[in-house]
């Protein structure tokens, strides 16, 4: 008999399997990102109820399955459902994007307390209030920090020189951040120019985190910050996330 495990985690993804089963991806405190197989989850609500839904924080009892990396889920109890998120399309889009980004940034079976705490903080904010682009930028920056991929936006990534009070700089994902005008010719082809205001906004959100996301950014600055981080993430992930495409479609709903 395999050892019974007790895990506290957040549901990042849930996929129906066959006629009655469900496969979930959890970000857990104890084992990091894991996959779990819930036999009969859709046929009977006795063991799992409605707990195996994205964004749910839960405690799961599970066992390792011989010959498989996937855990067998036996029962779960909900700690926080984040039900407020599901009542508004913009909040669903932001939460889904945050969950997919978290899933892509970490490897299986590696505990990642910093990212889990950040994701719970962000989902808690979405559960309690409206989705805002500044919060999403703060989450992206925090997730990149947790994954060791934080871009340099407070100074030139090449020479370390301070950025001027105004003007524009190049944002080069391959080099890891902004390039001042003298270093800008070394940027990769297609690396965008961004305003000092956008770079400064990203630096502030990087330093203050979600707590600093209450101050609204001017629309043009917000768009530059969004596009710069989107390019950075695509460069490092190697693709555009599916949830990002959905988020772009509902962007006007949150002013993004």
UniProtKB/Swiss-Prot annotation:
Entry-linked InterPro entries: ARFGAP/RecO, DNA_rep/recomb_RecO_N, NA-bd_OB-fold, RecO, RecO_C
GO biological process entries: DNA recombination; double-strand break repair
Pfam families tied to this protein: RecO_C, RecO_N
Keywords, sorted A to Z: DNA damage, DNA recombination, DNA repair
GO annotation, cellular component aspect: bacterial nucleoid
Keyword DNA repair recorded: yes
Family according to the record: Belongs to the RecO family.
Function: Involved in DNA repair and RecF pathway recombination.
Name this protein carries in UniProt: DNA repair protein RecO
């Amino acid at each position: 008999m395999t050892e019974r495990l007790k895990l506290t985690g957040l549901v990042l993804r849930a996929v129906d399997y066959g006629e009655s089963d469900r496969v979930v991806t959890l970000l857990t405190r104890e084992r990091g990102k894991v996959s779990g197989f819930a036999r009969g989850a859709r046929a009977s609500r006795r063991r799992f109820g409605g707990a195996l839904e994205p964004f749910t924080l839960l405690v799961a009892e599970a066992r390792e399955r011989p010959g498989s990396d996937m855990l067998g889920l036996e029962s779960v109890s909900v700690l926080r459902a984040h039900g407020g998120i599901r009542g508004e399309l913009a909040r669903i889009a932001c939460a889904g994007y945050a969950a997919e980004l978290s899933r892509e940034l970490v490897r299986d079976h590696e505990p990642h307390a910093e990212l889990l705490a950040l994701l719970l903080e962000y989902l808690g904010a979405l559960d309690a209030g409206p989705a805002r682009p500044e919060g999403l930028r703060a989450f992206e920056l925090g997730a990149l920090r947790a994954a060791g991929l934080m871009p340099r936006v407070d100074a030139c990534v090449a020479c370390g020189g301070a950025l001027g009070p105004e003007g524009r700089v190049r944002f080069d994902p391959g080099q890891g951040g902004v390039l001042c005008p003298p270093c800008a010719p070394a940027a990769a082809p297609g690396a965008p120019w961004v305003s000092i205001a956008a770079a400064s906004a990203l630096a502030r959100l990087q330093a203050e985190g979600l707590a600093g996301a209450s101050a609204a950014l001017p629309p043009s600055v917000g768009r530059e910050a969004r596009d710069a981080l989107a390019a950075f993430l695509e460069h490092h992930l190697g693709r555009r996330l599916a949830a990002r495409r959905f988020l772009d479609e509902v962007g006007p709903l949150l002013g993004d």
